[in-house]
Amino acid sequence: GIIFIDDGAAKALSNGKSLLAAGVLKIKGSFDKGENVLIVDKDENHLARGLASFNSKEIDKIKGKQSKEIENTLGYFSKSEIIHKDNMVKL
């Protein structure tokens, strides 16, 4: 799968930060929690790969939302990061 992120999230990733839902624009493809996904900017430049903390359906529901909104949107709290910095490698 592919996760498209905004410019703010791209800058955060370049500074070694985790990917949060607020920076996600859209997803492409279907994937499960724990799968290796590609992170791209809006121009489809490859930025990083990482292990997703949520499946593609969950990310589609929480994309663009603040971390505090995740629990209300999904009905449970998991993690605040879409991909934690420790589970990501920059390309």
Show which residues each predicted segment covers.
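Beta-strand/loop-dominated core regions that host nucleotide or nucleotide-derived cofactor-binding catalytic loops
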Residues: 2-5, 9-91
